[in-house]
């Protein structure tokens, strides 16, 4: 079994009087893609933000066996990168310059930074936009650009690498959805990264993730492999939706279809 690199114990979170996360414990392992799933308002993005430290909390969270509080921000930034669901960047940077921001925690020359940024821009299919102004890009182009940025950030992470992606396919067309998740899976399998991704598409999650964590009303309902997690009974429990689950005709993963 792959070793645990991120763990959270008894995680709870309130917004006002609303309990958003209710006593969740979770382990994230190197070499695996873990998908956080659930309906709107289930707590997926909040859990991701708590795990990466974006939202301050007193919950017990460890990175690589050490408490979150023991890590200096400039050090954990070399090993943990977070792709947010939305970017608030409004300055007229060139697309290439946005990706180069990912190299801030790294020890690189200007030339090395640019070369690295262009490498990851090619990987995420935005190299042709390198000299374009960021505000002029489409939502999907911005999403792929920021993926290149967080990949750049983790370039010098060595054998300690956590990649967190919050709905990275939400603005993407079909081909780029699959390419993005192939990149995530490659990071896990080829680089032994721990990848955590928030998704809404159960079939994409089933195809690319090793583990599916299903949340409902702030509670962890299931943490298992796709075949065990995606049963018609559990899908109806979590989503209130009747479904049929079949095997993909050529690949070994379950597919979810409407029951009627």
From Swiss-Prot:
Which keywords accompany this UniProt record?
Answer: ATP-binding, Cell inner membrane, Cell membrane, Membrane, Nucleotide-binding, Translocase, Transport
Broadest EC class assigned to this enzyme: translocase
Q: Which residues form a coiled coil?
A: none
What Gene3D superfamilies does the record tag this protein with?
P-loop containing nucleotide triphosphate hydrolases
Binding-site residues, ATP: 38-45
> Where is the ABC transporter domain positioned along the sequence?
6-242
Similarity comment: Belongs to the ABC transporter superfamily. Heme (hemin) importer (TC 3.A.1.14.5) family.
Please explain the role this protein plays, according to its UniProt record: Part of the ABC transporter complex HmuTUV involved in hemin import. Responsible for energy coupling to the transport system.
Write the protein's name. Hemin import ATP-binding protein HmuV
- Gene giving rise to this polypeptide: hmuV
